[in-house]
């Protein structure tokens, strides 16, 4: 993302934690030092009391890495470099470091991977770890079983091997990737594996913020899995095609379409009288007909009040 957009995301991390009444961060874990994983942590160092910072023991040549290390030093925090097998008590549970087992030239394989256990519930957070790191974890013989697997490297083809999925047997997979990202994440091969194993999927590009709460016995979520196994590049191509078709349809019909008088709504009118768009499938209403994977040709218009009365909810992406 651009520096301006990146700064917005960093502020969102801080604001989310403040909304949860977080004042102290017991453990801040920097999986590795790529900008998309490190950026929000600097803001957190400046806004919260941080007890421990865990990171990977290598030097990244970037201004952001230098800022991160200098900010930690300014707050009298020494970055700790854990070893595989190190376990940390955390609330009613604990987490164990699963990787990296050594430092690689590939920064993604330097990701600190943890397995968090709370009672009968378990989560594994992969960072950007790729297949080499996955094989290292499997070779240790450590328990990789987890209820929730946060997929490595945004679902890229270089991560989430069959061996890892068979070793971890997750009940749910969480995929963090940007909407319409230029990398084409997630990869078709990754999504095919999840589909073939019937693993329910949550995706940030489809669903926004995803929250899982563990009480030690059950895991509750803020929404249902989307189970969208479409590859990122295919989704982008489909969206571009839909927009192109909609533009062509509009251009062809403009000349023959009768003039229609439209009435400008009174600015003081109830916002539930405003027009919204509803896709042919889905449970959300939208501010535009081409949000996400919507087909503009099949989108219909209703008032917001009508949409609400039918059980639709506002899309968090476009409102």
Question: Which stretches of residues belong to each language-model region?
Answer:
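Active-site HxH/HxHxD metal-binding segment of metal-dependent hydrolases
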Residues: 35-74
């Amino acid at each position: 993302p651009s520096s301006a957009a990146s700064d917005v995301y960093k502020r969102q991390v801080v604001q989310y934690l403040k909304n949860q009444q977080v004042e102290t961060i017991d453990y801040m874990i920097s999986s590795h030092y790529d900008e998309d994983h490190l950026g929000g942590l600097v803001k957190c160092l400046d806004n919260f009391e941080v007890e421990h910072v865990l990171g990977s023991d290598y030097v990244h040549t970037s201004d952001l890495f230098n800022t991160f290390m200098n900010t930690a030093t300014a707050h009298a925090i020494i970055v700790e470099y854990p070893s595989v097998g190190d376990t940390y008590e955390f609330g009613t549970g604990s987490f164990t470091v699963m990787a990296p087992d050594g430092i690689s030239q590939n920064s993604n394989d330097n990701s600190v991977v943890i397995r968090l256990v709370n009672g009968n519930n378990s989560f594994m957070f992969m960072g950007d770890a790729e297949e080499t790191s996955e094989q290292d974890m499997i070779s240790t013989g450590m328990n990789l079983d987890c209820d929730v697997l946060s997929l490595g490297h945004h679902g890229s083809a270089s991560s989430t091997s069959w061996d890892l999925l068979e070793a971890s047997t997750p009940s749910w997979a969480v995929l963090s990737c940007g909407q319409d990202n230029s990398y084409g994440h997630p990869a078709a091969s990754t999504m095919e594996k999840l589909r073939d194993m019937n693993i329910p999927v949550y995706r940030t590009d489809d669903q926004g913020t995803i929250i899982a709460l563990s009480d030690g016995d059950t895991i509750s979520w803020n929404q249902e899995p989307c189970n969208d196994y479409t590859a990122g590049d295919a989704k982008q191509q489909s969206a571009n095609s839909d927009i192109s078709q909609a533009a062509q349809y509009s251009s062809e019909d403009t000349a023959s379409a009768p003039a229609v008088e439209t009435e400008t709504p009174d600015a003081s009118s109830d916002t539930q009288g405003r027009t919204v768009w509803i896709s042919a499938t889905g449970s959300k209403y939208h501010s535009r007909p081409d949000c996400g994977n919507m087909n503009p040709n099949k989108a219909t218009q209703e008032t917001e009040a009508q949409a609400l009365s039918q059980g639709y909810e506002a899309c968090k992406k476009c409102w």
